[in-house]
Regions:
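Acidic active-site catalytic centers that drive phospho-/nucleotidyl reactions
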Residues: 6, 44, 102, 120-123
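Short, well-structured N-terminal submotif of metal-dependent ribonuclease cores
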Residues: 1-37, 41, 51-69, 138-140
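General small-molecule cofactor/ligand-binding pocket signal
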Residues: 36, 79, 132
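A generic structural signal for short hydrophobic patches within well-formed alpha-helices
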Residues: 10, 42-45, 86, 124
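Active-site neighborhoods of divalent-metal-dependent phosphate/nucleic-acid chemistry enzymes
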Residues: 47-55, 61, 65, 72-119
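Short, flexible helix/strand-to-coil boundary loops that buttress conserved ligand/catalytic motifs
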Residues: 14, 49, 93, 128, ...
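Acidic, PIN/NYN-like endoribonuclease modules and their adjacent C-terminal/linker elements
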Residues: 1-2, 106, 110-140
Length: 140
């Protein structure tokens, strides 16, 4: 099984020892080579950093370092939005109203035959994508 990691999951894992135990257990049981990120996740992390920067430059700098580590660690396993993802997004967005980034993540997972790992399962329910919420179960 290969996995597309949503922003809420990679952010949870960043917490280290404060990470939710079920998420930590799931993360420990998967191989790095089976984990993928969307470029949109990197964008969401960047947006968060820029939101923090005006009020806490030190925290923003720490998050910058973490983001650089994530980009380095995932390297070629960062997936962009190409024509196939865009067309799939168009099809699934016609099914019902879905936040754009969530629908693009679902489309990316569908195109690349990945399981979307997210806490926000309701956002992609009924779109045909396989989903895992590791907050609920470390084994499924």
């Amino acid at each position: 099984v290969t996995w597309l990691i949503d922003t809420n999951i990679i952010s949870e894992v960043r917490k280290g020892p404060r990470c939710h135990p079920a998420v930590a257990a799931w993360w420990a049981g998967v191989e790095d080579r089976d984990l993928f990120l969307s470029a949109l996740t990197l964008g969401e992390i960047r947006k968060g950093i820029e939101g923090v920067r005006p009020r806490d430059p030190g925290r923003a700098a720490a998050l910058e370092g973490w983001l650089a580590e994530v980009v380095d660690a995932f390297g070629p396993r960062v997936l962009g939005v190409d024509a196939a993802v865009a067309e799939t997004w168009g099809r699934i967005s016609a099914l019902r109203s879905v936040p754009v980034v969530d629908a693009l993540l679902a489309a990316t997972a569908l195109v690349h035959d990945l399981v979307l790992v997210t806490r926000n399962t309701a956002d992609v329910e009924g779109l045909g994508v396989q989903v895992l919420n590791p907050f609920e179960s470390a084994t499924s």
